[in-house]
């Protein structure tokens, strides 16, 4: 019967439950040691805005960096073609042109003046040289060298 007993033991399954306790290591500073605090001179100063700092579009976002370049409108009512572009733009450095600020003109007259200025601006010939974003380098000479094997 010992062989039967061994077979019955082999067919049995045993469940063993092992319980582990997790150990947590907590590090604490020694109570006698004190962490040195920063002196008042070393503390980081906070930004304080003057009253003359402009609020960015009334959103309480005050910035010190310039985020865009302002190009004042040019006054096209003066037909002086001899003036250079930067001189005329600095001469009309107000936020809008004179015709828009002119209260003697009604809405339709100001509108027509704006349309005329816009047409003049579009009709002016742009310089033929491309700007930095439009410039495309010419690699044709390199392409021909590598295609023909003239390395």
Curated annotation (Swiss-Prot):
| Gene Ontology molecular function: any one | protein serine/threonine phosphatase inhibitor activity
Q: Where is this region: Disordered?
A: 1-56, 78-151
Lineage top rank: taxon: Eukaryota
Where does the record place it? Nucleus
The entry's cellular-component GO terms read: nucleus; protein phosphatase type 1 complex
Q: Which GO terms describe its biological process?
A: glycogen metabolic process; intracellular monoatomic ion homeostasis; mitotic spindle assembly checkpoint signaling; regulation of protein localization to nucleus
Keywords, in A-Z order: Nucleus
Report biased composition (Polar residues) as residue ranges: 1-34
Primary residence: nucleus
Q: Keyword Nucleotidyltransferase: yes or no?
A: no
Composition-biased stretches (Low complexity): 87-98
Bias (Basic and acidic residues) ranges: 39-56
Annotated disulfide bonds: none
Per UniProt, the ranges with Basic residues bias are 112-124
Which family does the entry's similarity section mention? Answer: Belongs to the YPI1 family.
Function, in words: Regulator of type 1 phosphatases which maintains protein phosphatase activity under strict control.
What's the protein here called? Type 1 phosphatases regulator YPI1
Q: What is the species of this protein? A: Eremothecium gossypii (strain ATCC 10895 / CBS 109.51 / FGSC 9923 / NRRL Y-1056) (Yeast)
Lineage, highest ranks first: Eukaryota, Fungi, Dikarya, Ascomycota, Saccharomycotina
